[in-house]
């Protein structure tokens, strides 16, 4: 919370076919401090996975990743929105899994992604920064990851997209849920792709995320 600013707000517009544009007023979200992270130490101690994104200050993310690793957590970073500057090594060294989309992965790696081959190339470049695992989401095609040293495409379900607003968030949340419950990466990818595919068939963000019973 912030004594001076309201919570962050996002205005989302969609067009036919489900693609969207998002305008964000970060508000209090960008007032998150390292001290705030430290106050949450007990929550980190009880967690198995910590999932982060780039809508809060980098300094707070670095503090969160450091604390998470110190507490034995698996650290996942969804680098959204696409970073304007290179992500600092002091953040990446504590990230176990990075989940960018095509645009974000292209920005981070410097490799323009046009197909599975260039996606695999981008993954290899990003892994050289110290990140152990990378999954690149590629929209309606699904997601690609290195599994057993080989680029592996996990396809999305074929659906009629109404609103893609929460697709990435749904994918990341579902993937973490699957990993917490002991699924291997290949199975976790399939679970996350299914959840994400279901989410785009409904309008809205949080309301479009499927319950486990829908899976």
PLM feature spans:
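Conserved N-terminal subdomain of the carbohydrate kinase-like
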Residues: 1-48, 215
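Beta-strand->loop->alpha-helix junctions that form or flank phosphate-binding loops
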Residues: 1-7, 78-80, 125, 135-138
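Short, acidic/turn-prone active-site loops that include or flank metal/cofactor-
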Residues: 3, 27-29, 80-82, 103-105, ...
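Structural motif
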Residues: 9-10, 19-22, 48-49, 73-75, ...
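Residues that scaffold the ATP/ADP-binding catalytic core of kinase and kinase-like folds
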Residues: 23, 107-110, 199
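Structured loop/turn residues at beta-strand edges in well-structured enzyme cores
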Residues: 42-45, 93, 129
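Conserved beta-alpha-beta core of the PfkB/ribokinase-like small-molecule kinase fold
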Residues: 49-121, 140-143
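Conserved phosphate-binding/catalytic region of the ribokinase-like
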Residues: 84-85, 89, 116-215
């Amino acid at each position: 919370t912030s004594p001076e600013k309201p919570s962050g707000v996002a205005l989302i517009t969609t067009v036919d076919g489900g693609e969207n544009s998002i305008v964000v007023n970060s508000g209090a979200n960008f007032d998150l401090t390292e001290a705030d992270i430290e106050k949450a130490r007990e929550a980190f101690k009880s967690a198995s996975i910590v999932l982060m994104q780039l809508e809060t200050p980098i300094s707070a993310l670095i503090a969160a990743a450091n604390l998470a690793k110190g507490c034995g957590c698996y650290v996942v970073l969804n680098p959204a929105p696409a970073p304007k500057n290179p992500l600092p090594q002091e953040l990446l060294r504590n990230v176990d899994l990075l989940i960018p989309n095509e645009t974000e992965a292209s920005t981070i790696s410097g490799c323009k992604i046009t197909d599975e081959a260039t996606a695999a190339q981008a993954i290899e470049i990003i892994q050289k920064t110290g990140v152990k695992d990378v999954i690149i989401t590629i929209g309606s095609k699904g997601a690609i990851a290195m599994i057993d040293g080989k680029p592996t495409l996990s396809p999305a379900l074929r659906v009629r997209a109404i609103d893609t607003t929460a697709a990435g968030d749904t994918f990341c949340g579902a993937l973490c849920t699957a990993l917490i419950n002991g699924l291997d990466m290949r199975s976790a990818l399939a679970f996350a792709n299914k959840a994400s595919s279901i989410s785009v068939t409904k309008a809205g963000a949080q309301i479009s995320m499927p319950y486990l019973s829908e899976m």
